[in-house]
Every structure is written in structure tokens, then in C-alpha cells.
Amino acid sequence: MKIVLAAINAKYIHANLAIYSLRAFSDEYKEQIQIKEYTINQYTELLHQLRPEMPVWFGGPEVSYDAAECLQRNHGVTGILRGEGEESFHELMQYYIGGSGKLQDIRGIIYREDGLLVDNGWREVMDLNKVPFVYEEMEDFKNKIIYYETSRGCPFSCSYCLSSV
């Protein structure tokens, strides 16, 4: 099985730190993980029609905020990783690629099962020291703007913004 990590609305010159963190955190599955940066949300329904057996997962603050509503609007999406996704993503890799574990045991996800939404709750905030350095192979970032995180989210929790989620 191949895993594609796709950044929504990523520009050519911007590297999406989140998807590189997911790949780095699940290093033992690196050969199965491909990174694509383009607008995927418009293609999920088409992907579902062409390959209904292929799981499609979303993640990030935009979908974490109201994950159930997002799943109801996007029938081609299997589930959503909510909040910080590295540990949940790693467990999804163990489930799909390694053949171990159960979806109902993975904290931080909401997904479809037999037409119903199953909400496993939010995962605890992780220790950022566990996330490996993502820029080991700098040739992947030639002519791109790269990002460094010194903290997660925004501390201000403005009512109109999802960056603090």
C-alpha cells in the first residue's frame, strides 16, 4: 500500500511542514509515504468514485474544528485526524500498512464505519521533542520557503481563527 500525504492549497514555493512532520514521525513507513502538495479537497469525491476502497483521511485545524460536519459534507473522506496528528497518523500507518491495531483504539480520529460516524475523542497534546527534525534531506526543499516550528498553534484563541485549534 502507498500512502500519499497531500497539502491543501499549498503553493509551489512553500513547503508544508505538517506533512513532512507526519512522514518523519512514521519513519519506518517512509518508503510507502509519498508527499504531494496541491489542492486535494476538490478531488476527494472523484477519488472515491474511482477507487471507493481507497481510504482518504483529512487533518489539520480547518477540519479538526468541526470534524463531524466535514465528514458529512465530504462523503469521499474516510476519516479525520484531529489536533496534532503525528501519533494518530503513526497508528493509522500501523493499521493500514502493518496490519496491526484497530481504528477504534486510535485516539484523535473520527471516521466512518458502517455508515455511522465513530468519534474516538481528542488525543493528548504531544511532547514536540518526539518529532524528528524534518529537514534532513535539504534537496527536497530547493527553491522553496521552509518553516520552523518553535510552538504549535497560536496562543491568542481569536474567535474568528482556527490557528489555535
Regions found by a protein language model. Give the residues of each.
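Nucleotide-activated donor-dependent transferases that construct or modify glycoconjugates
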Residues: M1-K11
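Glycine-rich beta-alpha loop elements in corrinoid/cobalamin-binding modules
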Residues: K2, A18, L22-S26, Q34-E124
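A cross-family glycoside hydrolase active-site/sugar-binding cleft signature
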Residues: A6, W57-G59, E149
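Residue-level recognition of beta-strand->loop/alpha-helix junctions
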Residues: A7-N9, E37-T39, V165
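Glycine- and acidic-residue-enriched helix-capping/strand-helix junction motifs
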Residues: A10-I19
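Secondary-structure boundary/capping motif
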Residues: H14-A15, D66, K130, Y135
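Gly/serine-rich nucleotide phosphate-binding loop at the start of the catalytic core
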Residues: E31
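Radical SAM [4Fe-4S] cluster-binding motif and immediate context
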Residues: N129-V165
